[in-house]
């Protein structure tokens, strides 16, 4: 016999359809009371003792770049040119593990949720907002604890030196992708507003182009697709669908996160330590064969296997 478990809301409540979907997937917005109580015991700011043993980067010009709607600012960057002409790039990630201890109620809840869930009009966070939007968010002009990959990169895009360490930073600005894209496009008003970091943005553009060029030479593919965003009104009803345009700012951050991820992965691989890697597995033979058959219909002959593809383009007609 069926019984009432919970009342989600009235059918006409704003956003009730989204809440229904979340409930049907066992994605719970509310946190258990014991998790919230533990979150309340987390301080609002680091203490002096928290900073001990950490590399102090608060004097570096460091800033975040995110979407305009972002609230949990979990990564930041700094960049400068060294005397030898190389770039120093720092990628800083909020040190959540300093506050969320293994086996704690916060840790168990985060393990159960696995990730933050982004839907049309809201975010269901992995951690309570006191942490995700507070001390674990790299908000401007406040001290924040971070894990950092600091890399020296030469003019060919090679990481010649790196340091991976615990740090303390203080971001200068909370930048949006549109702000940075405007500055790159020559918007003088934005350049004046954020003049302190304009030299950093110039360096970012230069380094991004170097890193992107190196990736393409290594055989990387550019899947630069536009993402749709559903616009809703105050009642939570969809009113429009717009395309998120990816500018150079978005691609720069992507380049910097990629080089940081590669550097960290290589670092721990050389140490032969247990580590979690995200890799692209070799394609299945039947999928490769389907692709070869499909490509041949366009006059392109492909030689190789799933282990090593060597392709020679021989189109029967010119392509642009």
Task: Enumerate the predicted regions with their spans.
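OB-fold/S1-family single-stranded nucleic acid-binding modules
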Residues: 1-13
């Amino acid at each position: 016999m069926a019984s009432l478990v919970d009342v989600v809301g009235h059918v006409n409540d704003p956003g009730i359809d989204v809440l229904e979907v979340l409930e049907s997937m066992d994605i719970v917005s509310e946190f258990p009371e014991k998790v919230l109580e533990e979150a309340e015991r987390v301080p609002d700011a680091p203490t002096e003792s928290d900073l001990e043993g950490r590399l102090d980067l608060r004097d570096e010009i460091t800033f975040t770049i995110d979407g305009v709607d972002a609230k949990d600012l979990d990564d930041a960057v700094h960049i400068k040119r060294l005397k030898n002409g190389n770039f120093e790039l720092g990628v800083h990630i909020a040190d959540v593990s300093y506050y969320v201890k293994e086996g704690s109620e916060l840790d168990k809840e985060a393990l159960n949720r696995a990730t933050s869930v982004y839907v049309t009009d809201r975010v269901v966070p992995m951690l309570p907002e006191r942490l995700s939007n507070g001390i674990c968010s790299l908000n401007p002009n406040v001290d924040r604890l971070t894990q950092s990959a600091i890399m020296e990169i030469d003019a060919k895009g090679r990481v010649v030196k790196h340091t991976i360490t615990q740090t303390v930073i203080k971001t200068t600005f909370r930048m949006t992708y549109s702000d940075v894209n405007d500055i790159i496009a020559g918007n003088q008003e934005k350049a004046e507003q954020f003049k302190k970091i304009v030299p950093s943005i110039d360096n970012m553009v230069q380094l991004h182009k170097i890193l992107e060029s190196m990736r393409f030479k290594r055989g990387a593919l550019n899947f630069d697709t536009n993402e749709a965003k559903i616009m809703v009104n105050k009642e939570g009803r969809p009113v429009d669908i717009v395309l998120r345009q990816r500018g150079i700012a978005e691609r720069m951050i992507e380049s910097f996160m990629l080089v940081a991820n590669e550097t960290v992965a290589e670092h721990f691989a050389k140490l032969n330590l247990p580590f979690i890697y995200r890799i692209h597995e070799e394609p299945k033979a039947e999928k490769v064969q389907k692709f070869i058959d499909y490509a041949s219909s366009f006059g392109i002959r492909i030689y190789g296997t799933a282990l090593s593809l060597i392709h020679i383009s021989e189109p029967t007609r010119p392509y642009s």
